[in-house]
């Protein structure tokens, strides 16, 4: 299985703060990679490097075989890399359909408006928001806005999707619904990296997991391997038996 993303020695500093230190990993196509760690561990900073908001101070990022280190977010979107944000900011004065249409217009396939609207309707059906298409984005609740954020990213037709805490603020039934959507996206061939604090979800949906702590990559492996790693237990999970329980829960 070929790698869609190669991350080599990524280091990022903000003045005297070193937010990331030589983070390195390869991501095979078609997998879900979970990215976990305490608050302030560098997870969102890594996303910001991967999608071009920040340029790394050291290291390289290769996406689909091309060096994209320091490329701008709009360029990476055209190449097929999309992301969601932890704090969703829809275009509140536009309808749900118009929000998703914008994603299609500025994505990988550079769609004309008419086709972009068709793509928006297809994605809204897929994501479960078709009946809300004519509503203003401002009228949606938190769970619906999370889905809209994901729909807007999907409309860009990404090869790689970065999901930043899409489960945050959701209740248990909403979490189950969102997990089902993430699996559907993966089943359509989209590779996913997801930052998440809902351990039950990330342990059961991820093919592999990377753990960051103070910007250091302290573990990488299958959920079972990561759950048994003493460094992860000390830095994040706390309870040695917690991970075992999470792995058994579906």
Named regions from a protein language model:
Residues 2-250:
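Glycine-rich phosphate-binding loops of nucleotide-dependent enzymes
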